[in-house]
Curated annotation (Swiss-Prot):
UniProt key word Transmembrane helix: no
Species annotation: Enterobacter sp. (strain 638)
Database matches in Pfam families: YceI (PF04264)
Superkingdom in the source lineage: Bacteria
Protein name from the UniProt record: UPF0312 protein Ent638_1570
Length: 192
C-alpha cells in the first residue's frame, strides 16, 4: 500500500512539474500587437515620442522558473518614426543612430529574475555599434488561449538608457541625457 501511494505521489509530482515548462513565443508583429517605443525630453519642456516600426523577436517564458526565460529582439533602426520627417532624418544620421553604418539594434537577455509580481530582464543592448547591459522592468499583462487555437502571452516593459553610453554624444541639454524605453509585446506560442 505504501509503495502504491508513493508511486501515485511521484507520478503526480512528475505530472505537475512536467506541465510547467518553458514555452517559446514569436513576437506578433504581423498582427500589430507589439510596439518598441521611446521618449526623450525636449529642452526640458515636453516629451518627444517615437517608435521603431520594423523589428522582430522571440521569447521563452516559464512562469514558474524565470531563470529559464529568454528574450531576443532585433530592430531595424532605419524604421525610427517620430512623426516628423526632418527630425527622423537627423536621428538616423551619424550624429545619432548612424543607421547607414549600424542598421540594426539588438537586445539579448542574459538573466531574468522575479521581482514581486514583475520581472527584471537584464541583457545586452547593442545600439550604434556599442553593446551595454540594460535592465528592463517587465510585467505580464496576460496569457492564455486565442480565438485561432493558439496560445499567447503579453508583456509590457520599461527601462532607461543614457545616450552617451551608446556613443551618441550630441548635446541635447541636461534634461535630455536619458531615453525612456516603453515596450509592449504579445507573443504567439510556437508549436513544438
Amino acid at each position: 500500500m505504501k509503495k502504491r501511494l508513493l508511486g501515485i505521489a511521484l507520478g503526480s509530482l512528475l505530472f505537475t512539474t512536467g506541465s510547467a515548462v518553458a514555452a517559446d513565443y514569436k513576437i506578433d508583429k504581423e498582427g500589430q500587437h507589439a510596439f518598441v517605443n521611446f521618449r526623450i525630453q525636449h529642452l526640458g519642456y515636453s516629451w518627444l515620442y517615437g517608435t521603431f516600426k520594423d523589428f522582430d523577436g522571440s521569447f521563452t517564458f516559464d512562469e514558474k522558473n524565470p531563470a529559464a526565460d529568454k528574450v531576443n529582439v532585433t530592430i531595424n533602426t532605419n524604421s525610427l518614426d517620430t512623426n516628423h520627417a526632418e527630425r527622423d532624418k537627423h536621428l538616423r544620421s551619424a550624429e545619432f543612430l548612424n543607421v547607414a553604418k549600424f542598421p540594426q539594434a539588438t537586445f539579448a537577455s542574459t538573466e531574468v529574475k522575479k521581482d514581486g509580481e514583475d520581472l527584471d530582464i537584464t541583457g545586452n543592448l547593442t545600439l550604434n555599434g556599442v553593446t551595454k547591459p540594460v535592465t528592463l522592468e517587465a510585467k505580464l499583462i496576460g496569457q492564455g488561449d486565442d480565438p485561432w487555437g493558439g496560445k499567447r502571452a503579453g508583456f509590457e516593459a520599461s527601462g532607461k538608457i543614457r545616450l552617451k553610453d551608446f556613443n551618441i554624444t550630441t548635446d541635447l541639454g541636461p534634461a535630455s541625457q536619458e531615453v525612456d524605453l516603453i515596450i509592449s509585446v504579445e507573443g504567439v506560442q510556437q508549436k513544438s
